[in-house]
């Protein structure tokens, strides 16, 4: 792929100098050696600043070649978003406007949209006001695409979920696990998977914390097989992709760890265990703030802790107690998150996880039995090693708890930088049954609305098409009878000859005698049969 991306001419109007410098560094990193005749990074960037048009097709084809590469700065995503802003009639982009574009306003409440319109072009898919662009990641049970909102000019991360898979496999949001004291509890009722989806969306809509990714909008349509969840876009992506030869230094890891600790405390305060804390699920904003993402295997609990059974999440980050099989085996959800947090901190500073194996059974055996070993390089402080070992105790009863991690000497730097209290960091979120029912609404189809309207006109819930059907049948009967009596009627060639009126009595079929009933209707006495009488009586009612 050497020198491939440099052959494309990217042109974006009025890009600030600081962004151009980032683009130049990124382009040099992507192109590498430019000793051949292809244009180098400098010529590419200068073309971008002097031309006022965008070759979108070239841009998209070029960016698709490198979509699998790591983009820690988010510049490539910004370039693609700029390429589709054809309707933006604002003035020249200043640095403040650029910051506003990359930092969406997340203070507004989560919206639920009940109709989705799609438009397809050669370069993108239009979904309501969102332009879907490249795939930027994959969650536990769905893909994530970069989306540009034409209304507020912001970038968002749009997660696409298959509703049929959700209903079939309990895919995205799982049923709460059984409790430890289930022999004394009432028999649990298996909830509809759609109800589990509704409850999880209702919870995510209310979560609001600087260190938790915000759910902005939910797009759903009964005529569409997909559910679209719009999250805030965190510009720099994942903190770290492991394994890596460039781990974080201890000071950077300290800052990121404290943010993650605040977000995890907020989730536990809301009675939610994440179950999949790892570096790739920790996203970094443009101001260096960590946000916890991907709640695909998260679980809500009641009481003081979640007693889980079974495995969920990433195997290398699972606690030893989660790997023990058995129908009556349960383990603490809070302790599982602390273990995953310890593995994450180890990966921050070492660049890999402590237990690695190509075979899952061998990996489980190492997690259960092998001790934590620190390599000779990089050299870690004693306080950092102590907190990692404390969070990675094999016995969950001896493992550090979250409030103990908050006051550890490495986290607080010997008490000079204390963490915020739980009261300052958290506020309780409650979700009522009514909110759960209303978070996912389904609009009826058009034919159902027409049927209900017809019933309203008749002022009763009968069959609004009964008279129409009877009228059509009577019209067919009249046409049939009139055609026989019509003198111009010509029967088919192979039809039997018609009988004369003189022979009608001889061929007449014996029919039962119809009993007539006299009815008084508006002063008139009529003779009708029983069927007609019932129709008249129903019409009177």
UniProtKB/Swiss-Prot annotation:
Pfam families tied to this protein: Pkinase
Segments for region (Autoinhibitory domain): 437-442
Gene that this polypeptide is encoded by: ckk-1
Protein kinase domain residues: 130-411
UniProt domain comment: The autoinhibitory domain overlaps with the calmodulin binding region and may be involved in intrasteric autoinhibition.
Biased composition regions of type Polar residues, renumbered to the chain: 93-106
**One CC-aspect GO term:** nucleus
Q: Does the keyword DNA-binding apply?
A: no
Matching entries from SUPFAM superfamilies are given as: Protein kinase-like (PK-like)
Q: Which organism is it from?
A: Caenorhabditis elegans
Briefly describe activity regulation. Answer: Activated by Ca(2+)/calmodulin. Binding of calmodulin may relieve intrasteric autoinhibition.
Start-end of Low complexity biased regions: 497-507
**Belongs to which family?**
Belongs to the protein kinase superfamily. Ser/Thr protein kinase family.
Q: What is this protein called?
A: Calcium/calmodulin-dependent protein kinase kinase
